[in-house]
Amino acid sequence: MQIGYICTNYNNSHFTVNAVRSLVASAAGNHELRIVIVDNLSSPEHRHTLAKLGQEFSYVDVLFNDENVGYFSGLNCGIRHMRQHHPEIMHFVIGNNDLLFPIDFCSKFEKHLSLLATYPVISPDIVTLDGEHQNPHVIKSISRTREIIYDLYYSNYFLAQAIIWAARFSHPLTDRKDERQHQTAQSIYQGHGSCYLIGPKFFDLFEELWAPTFLMGEEYFLSKQLSDRGMRTYYTPSISLTHCCHGSLCSVPNKKLWEFARQAHREYRKYVKVFG
């Protein structure tokens, strides 16, 4: 099977190296890989690491952007490169660089090719280092109460910190239950943005990802891109991988990340209204 992997990198090339090596081990000579790493203007040290990785593996292409274009826009750089230079590749893993692929990942991907002929996007079972499942991210919809909390969260940074603090104590009552269905394969509203599998059906409908924001909110924007064409994401627990973050830390943004998320939330509110 031919598999493409596209990821972005920004000043954390050690994650990229580990992701590539784990995917290479999974391919184990039985699958043909083509990998595109999109660097979003990292420091010279990290660019040097990526250049060495590209020299080590002939099937790894590294694109060095002259500016940081963001997450989905960065992935689109990789998608365009793949489609132009390696059009024979039709099945892709796209997403973060801080992923680790188990030894059976490529084989399990191959067993699910029929899904990618029906669904544009597959979301795999994504598990953090401390064992939290990040999919299915949103199965049906987000409640109005939670939407109001999101508005409060993005209204003020200090209020956002207070909401995070309160959520730690109310977690058993207020946490969304969607991820608890991680053992059930099903059609879902949103898959976690750290990794998606795309294939022929996606390219029958689209040329690339819809990327209206720099960072954050990708789950919704992809779900809208799909729903506008009458499609949804499919979640399967049969394909799994590790996301190299601790679940307790993934939801605690610094101020810069919060500002990116607020910009994405404002864009999101253009399409999803709490009332009306």
Q: Where are the predicted features?
A:
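Short, well-formed alpha-helical segments that are part of the catalytic scaffolds
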Residues: N12-A27
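A conserved acidic beta->alpha catalytic loop
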Residues: S22, I37-L50, E67, F101
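Glycine-rich, basic loop-to-helix element that forms the pyrophosphate-binding segment
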Residues: D66-R83
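Short beta-strand-to-loop acidic/aromatic patch adjacent to the donor-nucleotide binding site
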Residues: P87-L100
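Conserved donor NDP-sugar-binding/catalytic core segment of glycosyltransferases
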Residues: L100-V138
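A recurrent flexible, glycine/aromatic-enriched loop bordering the glycosyltransferase active site
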Residues: F158-R168, K177-L197, C250
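Active-site-adjacent helix/loop segment of glycosyltransferases
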Residues: A162-W165, W210, Y220-G276
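A short, conserved alpha-helix in the catalytic core of glycosyltransferases
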Residues: Q181-T184, Y189-E208, P212-I239
